[in-house]
Amino acid sequence: MAKAPANNAAQRVRKKVRKNVADGIAHVHASFNNTIITITDRQGNALSWASSGGQGFKGSRKSTPFAAQVASEVAGRAAVEQGIKNLDVEIKGPGPGRESSVRALAALGIRINSIADVTPVPHNGCRPQKRRRI
């Protein structure tokens, strides 16, 4: 006798918890290959996130300002559904999506309180990788 397949999919579905958070922090990680945007509350609990690669951009198109803009819009819309109205933006990295991601968040009607560059800069710590030769 074969068992009937258990309906595990219905058991694993988690109900999305909607939080009412007015203030938050947008962490923008802009590398040369991708841009990742995470929107958190003041305590650091993630409310929403998106990346350029997750929005369907692959290869060199991930590292464009337009891909960062699309990812910011997706993360921003999800954060607005959670009740976000004000954001502090922390940008990390030298990538091309730095400015366009902030503009996309502002275009959604989210008030941007401050923009901070938190790119880690070594005080001559580890030796960098070898020079790239093309």
Swiss-Prot record:
SUPFAM superfamilies: Translational machinery components. One of its GO terms (cellular component) is ribosome. GO terms for molecular function: rRNA binding; structural constituent of ribosome. It comes from the Bacteria. Keywords: Ribonucleoprotein, Ribosomal protein, RNA-binding, rRNA-binding. InterPro entries: Ribosomal_uS11 (IPR001971), Ribosomal_uS11_bac-type (IPR019981), Ribosomal_uS11_CS (IPR018102), Ribosomal_uS11_sf (IPR036967). GO terms for biological process: translation. The keyword rRNA-binding applies. Signal peptide: none annotated. It holds the Pfam family Ribosomal_S11. Belongs to the universal ribosomal protein uS11 family. Located on the platform of the 30S subunit, it bridges several disparate RNA helices of the 16S rRNA. Forms part of the Shine-Dalgarno cleft in the 70S ribosome. PANTHER family: 40S RIBOSOMAL PROTEIN S14/30S RIBOSOMAL PROTEIN S11. Part of the 30S ribosomal subunit. Interacts with proteins S7 and S18. Binds to IF-3. NCBIfam families: PRK05309.1, uS11_bact. This is Small ribosomal subunit protein uS11. It comes from Variovorax paradoxus (strain S110). The gene is rpsK.
